Amino acid sequence: MSNTTWGLQRDITPRLGARLVQEGNQLHYLADRASITGKFSDAECPKLDVVFPHFISQIESMLTTGELNPRHAQCVTLYHNGFTCEADTLGSCGYVYIAVYPTQR
């Protein structure tokens, strides 16, 4: 078992972090490039299954419009159904790093 923490590093738990592979304006999720820090509740898990693809679609749209640029680091924050997603290319020209967590109130 690896102790690697993927995605944007945030001091928030629980958190899903991932390094998504960018191919044009499309993103690919690789399970071996993702990690969960902390434990999502039984109520949060099904919601996470719904919001995750929504966030991916929003990020892909931002890549299409140029709002998110693979060559320049710029963190964007998205909200949906009680969850927050932070995304940034970190200027990596091929990856989008994300952190998804329950919205803090």
Swiss-Prot record:
Transmembrane segments: none
Example GO BP: positive regulation of cytoskeleton organization
A Pfam family recorded for this sequence: CbeA_antitoxin
Gene ablation phenotype (knockout): Single deletion has no effect on expression of cognate toxin ypjF i.e. the probable operon is not autoregulatory. Single deletion leads to increased biofilm formation, deletion of 3 type IV antitoxin genes (cbeA, yafW, yfjZ) has no effect on cell growth.
Keyword entries, A-Z: Toxin-antitoxin system
Induction: Expressed in mid-log phase at considerably lower levels than antitoxin relB.
Cross-referenced InterPro entries: Antitoxin_CbeA (IPR009320), CbeA_sf (IPR038025)
SUPFAM superfamilies assigned: YeeU-like (SSF143737)
Family the entry assigns: Belongs to the CbeA/YafW/YfjZ antitoxin family.
Note: Encoded in prophage CP4-57.
Function as written in the Swiss-Prot or TrEMBL entry: Antitoxin component of a type IV toxin-antitoxin (TA) system. Antitoxin that counteracts the effect of cognate toxin YpjF. Also counteracts the effect of non-cognate toxins CbtA and YfkI.
Record protein name field: Antitoxin YfjZ
Gene this protein is translated from: yfjZ
